[in-house]
Amino acid sequence: MEMTNAQRLILSNQYKMMTMLDPANAERYRRLQTIIERGYGLQMRELDREFGELKEETCRTIIDIMEMYHALHVSWSNLQDQQSIDERRVTFLGFDAATEARYLGYVRFMVNVEGRYTHFDAGTHGFNAQTPMWEKYQRMLNVWHACPRQYHLSANEINQIINA
């Protein structure tokens, strides 16, 4: 991230104010303030990640993934023989914090800030699947979109989706 000295000074002052306004996160803000003031290039890349963007198409895909899991769980709940499919298989895991942090951040934003999909269980890891999931979800979406009744899936259709 390239910043002029004036921009760095302004951002440093913002972090200083945030330290006072949000004591619970003061240590984090002091760290970021030091990085900005001293211009540590490697650590400044963290700011690129924090100020990155997700394209509208990506956001819509993530919502579609979450909606698919909602449909999977509703359909599973309506099955007469739920024992044939483990409930954990139709539970949304989230994304990998190490390699899919922006996707994970968007999921957390949708659930915790926007109040959508609040019935999803964040588990002890807060939707951190701890393994890359994007490609798996893409395969699952392809199968789900081909189903004629996406919210009234049969056991066979559920299995096809989760095994994609």
From Swiss-Prot:
It comes from Escherichia coli (strain K12). NCBIfam families: PRK05445.1. This is UPF0304 protein YfbU. Pfam families: YfbU. It comes from the Bacteria. The gene is yfbU. Belongs to the UPF0304 family. InterPro entries: UPF0304_YfbU, YfbU_alpha-helical_sf, YfbU_helix-hairpin_sf. Signal peptide: none annotated. One of its GO terms (biological process) is DNA damage response.
